[in-house]
Amino acid sequence: MSEIPLFKNVENDGLDCRLFGYICDLEERGGFYDASEVYLAKLAQGFAQVELPVTKMHLNWQGKVQDGVYATEAAAAANFAFHTLDKIGVISSLSLHIKGQAGNGTVLLCEARALGISQSRIAPGVYEETYVIEIKIT
């Protein structure tokens, strides 16, 4: 097994260094990110940027990126954005509108930004926090 970390020069834009290190460690040890080839690029408070270099394994029979690849990258970016708020979240709803499709050799850059938070009462003394995450893939 290679000792080369999965992330390369992840940019820290003002995030606490301990939280930054924790998130980078999560990515490095997470086999999911290694298998899907999603790489962490930048972290800030409420913000995460990931990249995915498109290879043949990401393509459908037409030579275009499969829709599930976009969803995987978007979910990864959203999860990292949750972590920058020092929270752990679950994605309960994700909808994508794909305007165009990338091909082999493209690097998909995905940004996730926490826009807002709302709280709803589930039971007396029990609250659920809902985060709105804006995701942009270029």
Predicted features along the sequence, with ranges:
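Non-catalytic linker/capping segments at the edges of enzyme domains
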Residues: 1-51, 55-57
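Compact, glycine-rich, soluble single-domain proteins
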Residues: 62-79, 91
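Hydrophobic beta-strand-centered segment that forms part of the acyl-chain substrate-binding groove
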Residues: 79-109, 114
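HotDog/MaoC-like acyl-thioester-processing domains
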Residues: 1-17, 102-104, 109, 114-138
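A generic structural signal for short beta-strands and their flanking turns/coil linkers
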Residues: 34-36, 46-48, 90-94, 106-108, ...
